[in-house]
Design a protein with these regions (language model features):
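N-terminal extension/subdomain marker
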Residues: 1-37
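Amphipathic, charge-rich alpha-helical segments that serve as recognition/docking helices
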Residues: 135-137
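A sequence-level detector for short glycine-anchored, His/Arg-bearing signature motifs
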Residues: 108-123
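Ligand-binding loop in jelly-roll beta-barrel domains
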Residues: 125-127
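Generic beta-sheet signal
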Residues: 131-133
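Short alpha-helix boundary/capping and kink motifs at helix termini
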Residues: 24, 31, 40-43, 47-110, ...
């Protein structure tokens, strides 16, 4: 678990409502797709964190989704790109653990990135691996 500070954030991602799915830089998309997350997570996730409003946040993971946890999609569900889901299914079957990013607030746990990954995990009957970002305070 890490505590990170956003200073000079754009506020594009609103933690008080269901945000839209953000566009991430390729380097971060690759890290999430492969599950190879470098620490500190605050540095690795900085391009995403800079979309949040200024404040303190907690970043945890990667960790498996709890069986009783419900996730709210920020994009179409189920994902329309079946080939992308298939790509992640193949990766998961071969032992890779791609990581989805979730914004957890008091009202919901919203998928910011990883809709295809989560769909693939579900089709493989494996609990998804998540990075969880939560506002503090």
């Amino acid at each position: 678990m890490e505590q990170v500070t956003v200073d000079g954030g754009t506020g594009v991602i609103d933690t008080t409502s269901v945000p839209t799915q953000p566009e991430l830089p390729q380097s971060l998309r690759i890290a999430l797709a492969t599950g190879q997350m470098r620490r500190p997570l605050g540095d690795t996730l900085r391009p995403l964190l800079d979309l949040f409003a200024d404040g303190e946040y907690q970043v945890t993971g990667p960790e498996r989704l709890a069986e009783d946890r419900y996730l709210t999609p920020s994009a179409d569900w189920p994902p329309a790109d079946v080939s992308r889901v298939g790509y992640y299914r193949t990766a998961i079957k071969s032992g890779h653990r791609p990581v989805a990013v979730v914004l957890e607030t008091t009202g919901a746990a919203v998928i910011l990135d990883g809709h295809h990954k989560i769909a693939a995990y579900r089709e493989e009957a494996i609990l998804p691996h998540l990075l969880i970002i939560s506002p503090l305070g």
